[in-house]
């Protein structure tokens, strides 16, 4: 395995190993190694200067074994079909670990949204829905926000879908909507809240006291921000935060006594950057990755913990809040060095869990308070965490292997009952 392994091949290998360790019928791997449906579309957009550009878009529906497909849509210049297929596979197992009635889905458009005007972005978003309309629906495939997409884009998605659907207000076809338009309280904070719960429980499992732990978080976007906030709420102390600046590149902040979340957030809102924050010293990105911590939480980019970087990480536990932050080679090195790891499929699953709550609330037209959402989320995540930990102990496997195995158990039963093998 190398750091450049195709993401789909890497995901398939994890599924193969999990099926093998469980002693599954060979048909289980055959049914799960490839998506059931992948659609590629071309989306023409009339630009503000009068020219027409055509953008490539995709939607992958990995499995319908237990229910409709569910997963985000990303707008990014590096999106491609293999990435979308791999991410849809991961979503099947993320939902399976949580016991959700979903298979995995993922979509994308190859575009840098920063280069588009708001009008162009809206036309592109609506074009994606038009191209995929007959494959979407609250009982077919349910998209949500992902990289560079948000509640506004989900609102355009819904509006276009309703126009195509004979004005039926099937707003549950998309989640991650603003609260004013059928969204759920707690959705914006859901992933970071869930990460903090997983960090807390993983710390207990590996004998780390949260109140004494030195914790580092890479990234202060949506996931990183709410991870830091909720780790602090759980009694933890974040002493290092790494971030990126358009002008100055990668950098980090460090305070061994802990960085105050409220002060940091107020500084960022006032200055649009963390650079110059008086409550911590600025350090380099390289220093961030080599300092001594109890727990490190990559919450930004994929493939940041490479084989080389894994050799210098000085922590007892890695909790993957980002999607795919550890390369296969990095994973191998961490395991060899005895550094424990809680995988992304479990750690960052809070987002899809609260998306599920949004979908449920849309069906009933009855909406919960933020406190009710948090209570339900913690209970459901605790069930998944305990289940994954139990599988790891029963089979003497890593937590990454265990989360796939735990998910496969329920998916396997559904496929067998449906007569798929």
UniProtKB/Swiss-Prot annotation:
Residue positions of the active site: 106
Residues with site note (Important for catalysis): 146
Cross-referenced InterPro entries: Aminoacid_DH-like_N_sf (IPR046346), Glu/Leu/Phe/Val/Trp_DH (IPR006095), Glu/Leu/Phe/Val/Trp_DH_C (IPR006096), Glu/Leu/Phe/Val/Trp_DH_dimer (IPR006097), Glu/Leu/Phe/Val_DH_AS (IPR033524), Glu_DH (IPR014362), NAD(P)-bd_dom_sf (IPR036291), NAD_bind_Glu_DH (IPR033922)
Pfam families cross-referenced by the UniProt entry: ELFV_dehydrog, ELFV_dehydrog_N
Involved pathway(s): Amino-acid degradation; L-glutamate degradation via hydroxyglutarate pathway; crotonoyl-CoA from L-glutamate: step 1/5
Catalytic activity line of the entry: L-glutamate + NAD(+) + H2O = 2-oxoglutarate + NH4(+) + NADH + H(+)
Domain of life: Bacteria
Key words of the record: NAD, Oxidoreductase
Record PROSITE patterns: GLFV_DEHYDROGENASE
Binding site for NAD(+): 191, 222
Amino-acid biosynthesis in keyword set: no
Consequence the record notes for mutating residue 243 to R: Decrease of binding affinity for NADH and increase for NADPH
Result, substituting residue 245 to K: Decrease of binding affinity for NADH and increase for NADPH
GO molecular function annotation: glutamate dehydrogenase (NAD+) activity
Enzyme Commission (EC) number: 1.4.1.2
GO BP, sorted A to Z: amino acid metabolic process; glutamate catabolic process via 2-hydroxyglutarate
Binding positions (substrate): 70, 94, 355
Protein name: NAD-specific glutamate dehydrogenase
């Amino acid at each position: 395995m190398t750091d450049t392994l195709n993401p789909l091949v890497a995901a398939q290998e994890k599924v193969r190993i999990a099926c093998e360790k469980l002693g599954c019928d060979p048909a289980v791997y055959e049914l799960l190694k490839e998506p059931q449906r992948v659609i590629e579309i071309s989306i023409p957009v009339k630009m503000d200067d009068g020219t027409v550009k055509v953008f490539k878009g995709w939607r992958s529906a990995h499995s319908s074994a237990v229910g409709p497909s569910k997963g985000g849509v990303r707008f990014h210049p590096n999106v491609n079909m293999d990435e979308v297929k791999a991410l849809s596979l991961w979503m099947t197992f993320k939902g399976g670990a949580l016991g959700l009635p979903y298979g995995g889905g993922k979509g994308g458009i190859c575009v840098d949204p920063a280069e588009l005007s708001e009008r162009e972005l809206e036309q592109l978003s609506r074009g994606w829905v038009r191209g995929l309309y007959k494959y979407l629906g609250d009982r077919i495939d349910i998209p949500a926000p992902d990289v560079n997409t948000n509640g506004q884009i989900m609102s355009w998605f819904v509006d276009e879908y309703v126009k195509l659907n004979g004005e039926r207000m099937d707003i549950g076809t998309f989640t991650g909507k603003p609260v004013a338009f059928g969204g759920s309280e707690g959705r914006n904070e859901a992933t970071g809240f869930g990460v903090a719960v997983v960090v807390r429980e993983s710390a207990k499992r590996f004998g780390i006291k949260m109140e004494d732990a030195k914790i580092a978080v890479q990234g202060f976007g949506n996931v990183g921000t709410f991870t830091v906030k909720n780790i602090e709420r759980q009694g933890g102390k974040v002493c290092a935060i790494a971030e990126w600046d358009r002008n100055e590149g990668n950098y980090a902040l460090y305070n061994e006594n802990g960085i105050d979340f409220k002060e940091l957030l107020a500084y960022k809102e006032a200055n649009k950057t963390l650079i110059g924050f008086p409550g911590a010293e600025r350090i380099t990105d390289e220093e961030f990755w080599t300092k001594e911590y109890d727990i490190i939480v990559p919450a930004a980019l994929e493939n940041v913990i490479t084989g080389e970087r894994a050799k210098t990480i000085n922590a007892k536990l890695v909790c993957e809040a980002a999607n795919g932050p550890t390369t296969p080679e990095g994973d191998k090195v961490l395991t060899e060095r005895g550094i424990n790891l809680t995988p992304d499929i479990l750690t960052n699953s809070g987002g899809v869990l609260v998306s599920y709550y949004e979908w449920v609330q849309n069906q009933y037209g009855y909406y919960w308070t933020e406190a009710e959402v948090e209570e339900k989320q913690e209970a459901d995540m605790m069930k998944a965490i305990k289940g994954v930990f139990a599988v790891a102990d029963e089979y003497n496997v890593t937590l990454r292997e265990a989360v796939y195995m735990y998910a496969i158990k329920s998916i396997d039963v559904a496929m067998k009952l449906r007569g798929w093998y």
